[in-house]
């Protein structure tokens, strides 16, 4: 996250990491050690420590580069310019400035929501469906937790009692009522 490029959104992302890996390999490096990229809380302030994840099974979507998602190129002109405008809100002229994960995630999540609304090509839809099947119930449960965290806060103890059972009728109802938002959280993975 500290290694940034001119295309970054305020902190380094997976594309910056790939570039660093390529450069490191060209310099003779056999491996590159990174901090964990685990999923963080979806609400409130983003925890700066990668050692306090909300899940070790899923990744933090803050490391996605929105412009490299295939559907980004199908945005209309207005939404594409909005995504670029959101990116500029994350930039800091001072390379020594502290990373602002909250500012980056606020902007990036809005951009990702715009991109998620674009219809996928048939092959991308098939790949996403295959991914969902492969990741199974854990992915759906994690995405449901993300949604419930957005609605009720990240501590499930504070949720209405009927939402404490992830396989109960109330959670099943929420999954149906908010299927699009749950799909978004699965898509982020």
Can you say where each PLM-predicted feature lies in the sequence?
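Acidic/aromatic-lined carbohydrate-recognition and catalytic surfaces
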Residues: 1-189
């Amino acid at each position: 996250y500290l290694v940034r490029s001119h295309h970054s959104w305020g902190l380094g992302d997976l594309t910056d990491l790939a570039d660093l890996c390529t450069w490191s390999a060209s310099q003779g490096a056999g491996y590159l050690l990174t901090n964990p990229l685990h999923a963080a809380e979806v609400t409130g302030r983003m925890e700066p420590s990668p050692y306090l994840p909300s899940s070790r099974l899923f990744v933090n979507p803050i490391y996605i580069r929105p412009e490299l998602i295939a559907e980004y190129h199908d945005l209309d002109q207005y939404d594409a310019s909005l995504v670029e405008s959101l990116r500029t809100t994350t930039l800091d002229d001072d390379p020594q400035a502290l990373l602002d994960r909250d500012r980056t995630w606020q902007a990036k999540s809005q951009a990702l929501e715009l991109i998620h609304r674009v219809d996928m090509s048939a092959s991308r839809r098939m790949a996403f469906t295959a991914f969902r099947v492969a990741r199974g119930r854990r992915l759906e449960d994690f995405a449901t937790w993300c949604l419930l965290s957005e609605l009720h806060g990240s501590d499930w103890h504070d949720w209405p009692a009927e939402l404490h059972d992830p396989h109960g009728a109330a959670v099943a109802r929420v999954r149906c009522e908010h299927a699009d938002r749950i799909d978004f959280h699965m898509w982020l993975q």
